[in-house]
UniProtKB/Swiss-Prot annotation:
Organism the protein comes from: Arabidopsis thaliana
Residue positions binding ATP: 330-332, 338-340, 481, 529-532
Biased composition regions of type Low complexity, renumbered to the chain: 1-18
N-acetylserine: residues carrying this PTM: 2
Positions of Mg(2+) 2 binding: 481, 484
Keywords of this entry: Acetylation, Aminoacyl-tRNA synthetase, ATP-binding, Cytoplasm, DNA-binding, Endoplasmic reticulum, Ligase, Magnesium, Metal-binding, Nucleotide-binding, Protein biosynthesis
Family: Belongs to the class-II aminoacyl-tRNA synthetase family. Type 2 subfamily.
Name assigned to this protein: Aspartate--tRNA ligase 2, cytoplasmic
């Protein structure tokens, strides 16, 4: 999803299907809300019973200071070290991340915090709890012992802790008798004290353990007496807070951050300046109907489809090289695996010295750097994603392949695929061309340039040697378009003419066009969707997996 691309409207039949799907979705949402309300009432009753039981445990236990629910006073960050047993227990101690628990810490006392991932009591005197912090897990053992001041009531208390409850554990690092297969850490914690910061509902709308299973594991379980649950996409997104806790999702958003970080890092090194453009506009930045319209103090306005116009105006303001990481809004009805109505755009604009190939040079250097950074810096995260969603590493060349649009059309023609030489490539043609490029050049990342002018935005510069083509390009990963870029028209009269041809009211972009009347440099740039970069790098099947809280034609919450 590049922040410069335009998406064709759906057919009437598709729109009708989506309207029907939306009605079904609303009914399902009401049903889901009713179920959740019923669940909430039941949980309130269970909570009252649990608290009563917890109090009775502590009243008859000489070691009651070593466990229990943290009080509200303590949670309000009381400065009094005697405000409660939890504050007294953790006073002066430093928390250790679960991921840092290693054999070198044997016999050390540690304070850790995490969620109850699994809770497995084996007797009234012994229990095992796996604690999870982000994607890291460690086994905690609670064993009744006078010597360690762990009583039977403490074991019972741990039995009551529901999955996903948030707890602090103080204990000693030891080695298990046998290597552990169900945790990321190969040490275990002998529990001395445990305090619950916040309890989770006993019955959750989805299990994090279920949500973390790979499709292969689910299929294999179907052949057993206890088949695993498959958590569908709508359920995941309805309860996104729970879904985000899986190791794969934790890794996906670490990878997303790394893409953004590497993007900023390289561009800063290349003397680019980060900018922030307005998202409220008087007109439409791209033209067409895919705009979120609203009223702005009595004036018609819209949400920006891209920072296109303002990043060009920044160049006219002599900032020379700029980039932006920010939200992009598209009121499209495309309910596909790769389109969102709101996404994060990575946009670049720069002066051109001589030829628009300078922009493609930057794309080449920038994205080879990003891909290399992901492979070198994020091995653990890529492994976590691959465990649930297996994929082959992206194939890319040190020097990115460039083909002209005409060369791409010819490759398709030779493969028996007929396309309009002056039209755009549809999804099937893009995938086929990606397959052909992989077979011939052994790369899944390439640039296709000199697109027909008719399929590009109004501000795209025409080719010098053929007015039917433009100084523009798209970039592809695994057969899907990911970046759109071009040299821009910097001559105001030509801009006015092209805007009119594209159905844009020139008055709504008059300040944009006027900025070129004061002397404007040759310039160009590109835009790419952050979510789509991560989706295609990891070969994921849906962009909603790489959007924290996705917005599509049918989803406005959570």
């Amino acid at each position: 999803m590049s922040s410069e691309s335009e998406i064709p409207p759906l057919s009437s039949s598709t729109a009708a299907a989506e309207e029907s799907g939306e009605k079904t979705s609303k009914k399902a949402a009401k049903k889901e809300a009713a179920k959740l309300e019923k669940l909430r009432r039941r949980q309130e009753q269970e909570e009252a019973t649990r608290r009563t039981a917890s109090i009775s445990l502590e009243e008859n236990d000489e070691f009651s200071n070593n466990y229990g629910d943290v009080t509200l006073t303590e949670l309000q960050s009381s400065a009094d070290p005697k405000a409660g047993k939890w504050i007294e227990a953790v006073e002066g101690k430093e928390w250790t991340d679960v991921s840092d628990l290693v054999e070198e810490m044997l016999e050390s006392e540690v304070l850790i915090r995490g969620r109850v991932h699994t809770n497995r009591p084996t007797s009234n005197k012994l229990g095992f709890v796996v604690l999870r912090e982000s994607g890291s897990t460690v086994q905690c053992v609670v064993s009744q012992s006078e010597k360690t001041k762990v009583g039977a009531n403490m074991v019972k208390y741990l039995k009551q802790l529901s999955r996903e409850s948030f707890v602090d554990v103080i204990g000693v690092v030891t080695l298990p008798k046998e290597p552990l297969t169900g945790t990321t850490q190969q040490v275990e914690i002998q529990v001395r004290k445990v305090y619950c910061i916040n309890k989770s509902l006993a019955k959750l709308p989805l299990s994090v353990e279920d949500a973390a299973r790979s499709e292969a594991d689910i299929e294999a379980s179907l052949q057993t007496p206890s088949p695993a649950a498959r958590v569908n996409q709508d359920t995941r997104l309805n309860y996104r807070v729970l879904d985000l806790r899986t190791p794969a999702n934790q890794a996906i958003f670490q990878l997303q951050y790394e893409v953004e970080y590497a993007f900023r890092e390289k561009l800063r090194f290349k003397n680019f300046v980060g900018i922030h453009t307005p998202k409220l506009m008087a007109g439409s930045s791209e033209g067409g109907s895919a705009v979120f319209r609203l009223e702005y103090k009595g004036q018609p306005a819209c949400l920006a489809q891209s920072p296109q116009l303002h990043k060009q105006m920044a160049i006219c303001g002599d900032l020379r090289r700029v980039f932006e990481v920010g939200p992009v809004f598209r009121a499209e009805d495309s309910f596909t695996h790769r389109h969102l109505c709101e996404f994060v755009g990575l946009d670049v604009e720069m002066e051109i010295r001589k030829h628009y190939s300078e922009i493609m040079d930057l794309v080449d250097e920038l994205f080879v750097f990003i891909f290399t950074s992901l492979n070198e810096r994020c091995k653990k995260e890529l492994q976590a994603v691959g465990k649930q969603y297996p994929f082959e590493p992206l194939k890319f060349l040190p020097k990115t392949l460039r083909l002209t649009f005409e060369e791409g059309v010819q490759m398709l023609k030779e493969a028996g695929v007929e396309v309009d030489p002056l039209g755009d490539l549809n999804t099937e043609s893009e995938r086929k061309l990606g397959q052909l490029v992989l077979e011939k050049y052994n790369t899944e990342f390439y640039i296709l340039h000199r697109y027909p002018k008719a399929v590009r935005p109004f501000y795209t510069m025409t080719c010098a040697d053929n007015p039917l083509y433009s100084n523009s390009f798209d970039v592809f990963i695994r057969g899907e378009e990911i970046i759109s870029g071009a040299q821009r028209v910097h001559i105001p009269e030509v801009l006015e003419q092209r805007a009119g041809e594209c159905g844009i009211d020139v008055k709504t972009i008059s300040t944009y066009i006027d900025s070129f009347r004061y002397g404007a440099p040759l310039h160009g740039g590109f835009g790419v969707g952050l979510e789509r970069v991560v989706m295609l790098f990891c070969a994921l099947n849906n962009i909603r997996k790489t959007s924290l809280f996705p917005r599509d034609p049918q989803r406005l919450s959570p």
